[in-house]
A protein has these predicted regions:
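Phosphate-proximal small/polar/acidic motifs at interfaces that engage nucleotide phosphates
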Residues: 68-71, 77-181
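Amphipathic, non-membrane alpha-helical segments that mediate helix-helix packing
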Residues: 1-16, 22-76, 89-104, 163-181
Length: 181
């Protein structure tokens, strides 16, 4: 390809250093190669930005699923307190938990009141009874403004947990975006 052409032109120029044509060819090949590298860099930057957008979408989906699980927890708890069968609600909640697990690594703990607590694999609470903790897309100052994954700790600044997500769609997106090519 272009790299081989550049090195061949460079070799030709070194064998005939007094001739201007081979030197001109080296400059032309170097310019073409530099333009190609600039285009590749622009394409990679755009791909990283597009993946960062997908991270934001997946964070929103994750938060929607945790809200669904919390709402179903409340309905299950109410149904079972009043003696009603909550199996359909439990099935819906299980489906939401399974969908959540495709996005981020989670573990669950069923409580005696019929609710399920959902945690990240590192133990951060995502759902506790009818309450949720959100993931937040945080623009990174040291990663070209791309999104990191934050955990809403209730303060002014979320805790960055990107490195603590070990599986699921979010981990895959982070790995592709931040991996070495």
């Amino acid at each position: 390809g272009q790299l081989n052409e550049f090195f061949k032109a460079l070799q030709d120029a070194t064998t005939t250093p007094s001739q201007t044509t081979p030197r001109s060819v080296v400059l032309a090949k170097a310019s073409t190669l530099a333009s190609t590298f600039h285009q590749i860099n622009a394409d990679l930057t755009e791909t990283r930005r597009a993946i960062s957008v997908q991270i934001g979408v997946t964070i929103s989906e994750t938060n929607g699923l945790t809200r669904t699980i919390a709402e179903l927890n409340g309905k299950i708890k109410s149904a079972e307190i009043s003696g009603q069968n909550a199996n359909d609600l439990r099935d819906q909640r299980d489906l939401a938990i399974n969908q959540l697990a495709t996005r981020v690594d989670v573990s669950t703990l069923e409580r005696s009141d019929g609710t399920v607590s959902v945690f990240t694999a590192r133990g951060l609470v995502l759902v506790e009874q009818e309450t949720t903790r959100n993931l937040i897309g945080v623009e990174s100052s040291d990663n070209q403004g791309l999104l990191d994954i934050g955990y809403d700790i209730g303060g002014t600044k979320p805790s960055i947990i990107s490195d603590f997500i070990s599986s699921g769609k979010l981990r895959g997106l982070l790995d592709v975006r931040d991996g070495t090519i």
